[in-house]
Every structure is written in C-alpha cells, then in structure tokens.
Amino acid sequence: MGMIPGRAGAARLVIVGAHYDHVGVRNGQLYPGADDNASGVAAMLAVAGALTGQVTEASILFVAFDAEEQGLRGARHFVNHPPVDLRSVTAMVNLDMVGRGDANTLVVAGTSYTPSLRAVVADAARGRELAIAFGYDRPSAAGERGGDWTHSSDHGPFHDAGVPFLYFGVENHGDYHKPTDTADKIPAGFYTEVTQVVLDTVRRLAGGERSGGRDSAP
C-alpha cells in the first residue's frame, strides 16, 4: 500500500487497487498474466507516479491486492480489517485487465449504482481515442453480453460494504487465463489511452489540481 496525502487527510479517501496475483505455474507451464493483471498493476503504479507531488483534496490510497484469483481474498481481508475508515472512501477504483480491448473499447462498471460517477469518467475520456462501455453492473444483465460484473473482481467486497466503485476492464479474450497472455499482445496505444483516462478520473475524484507533478502517466 502507498498513500498520497490530500488536504482532507483521512477524512476523504479515494482507493485505487489492482490485484498482482495470477494463475502462476500449472504442470510446469508458466502463465504470464500480462493483461490479467500485470496491466492493472502497471497502470496503477503509473497513476501513482503521475499524481505524486500534485495537490489533491482527498488522500489517495494505492493498494496491490493478492489472492484475487482465489475468491477475492485479499480485497475481502482489506474490507473486513480496514486500515482506514471505509466511510471516508468516496470511491474505489479497480483496475483489472486494462491492456487490450475489443474494438478499442474500455468497460467501466459501477455507474449504475452511483450515477454521478459516469460524468466523471466521461469527462476524463473526452477526446481520447477509445470507446467507453458503461454498464456491466446490473443483476438483470446476467444473461446479456458481458453480464453483471458487480462481484467479478476486487471491487465486489467494497460494493458490499457500501463503497462506490469504478471497475475499469475489458471483455475476456482468447488468452484469458492461458499461457499465451503475454505482454507483446498489449497494444501500446490502447493501454496508454486507458491509463490516461484512469489518471484523469482519479484526479477528478480526488479534487486534484495540475501543479507540482507530471501532467500525464508515463
């Protein structure tokens, strides 16, 4: 975990998370997990680096979760034994598989529960060369394409605890949970655009001002 303190201190927090575990090795075969979820961890670190030194109202807590692939155990432990007051968390931003999207599309779930967050993401994505697909967070959508992703990753336990969330991700692809999920298949252009949208979203959520730090993610 790492914290960028804001003017409000612990009274107002934004959590940015990504799980760092993957399948590992099965039958002697390495599963690299480039998209799931090295892409999310690297994007989180880029956002943290870009925001370091900038002035924000809310404090920003960055968390790398373990054991997501074993039932969201890391996130559940965090929520069950929170090191911060969850009532002060205005949003949990979860990055899970953000490296490669069909038709240049980034999925953003969570806005059905907290509609005000949709405008925050839309503003952050304006002018970017990617499409934003909102939704994927309604129980009634279970039979639809994409379905309901409310509990599909580390944001789930936070949602159950009453914390608003934004889940940035992509549809499953043919290399999901396979040894072929390698870094060479992540398009640099798409990944850069996604990371910039996440950065601008977090900056808006935290009430950030563009001063003192880098203006974009490396």
Pin down the residues of each PLM region.
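Alpha-helical metal-binding/catalytic segments enriched in His/Glu/Asp
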Residues: G2, V16-G71, V198
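A non-catalytic alpha/beta surface segment that caps or lines the substrate-entry region
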Residues: M1-I4, G135
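His/Asp/Glu-rich mid-to-C-terminal helical/loop segments that flank catalytic regions of hydrolases
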Residues: G49, G169, H173-P218
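Second-shell loop/turn segments in exported
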Residues: N27-N37, A50, A64-F65, A103-T111, ...
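Metal-dependent peptidase/peptidase-like ectodomains
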Residues: G9, V55-T56, F65-Y167
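Proline/glycine-enriched tight loop/beta-turn segments at coil->beta junctions
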Residues: G6-L13
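Short connector loops/turns at beta-strand edges and beta->alpha or beta->beta junctions
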Residues: H19-V23, D96-R100, E171-G174
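Solvent-exposed, polar/charged alpha-helical surfaces in well-ordered, non-transmembrane soluble domains
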Residues: V41-G49, R76, A119-D123, G156, ...
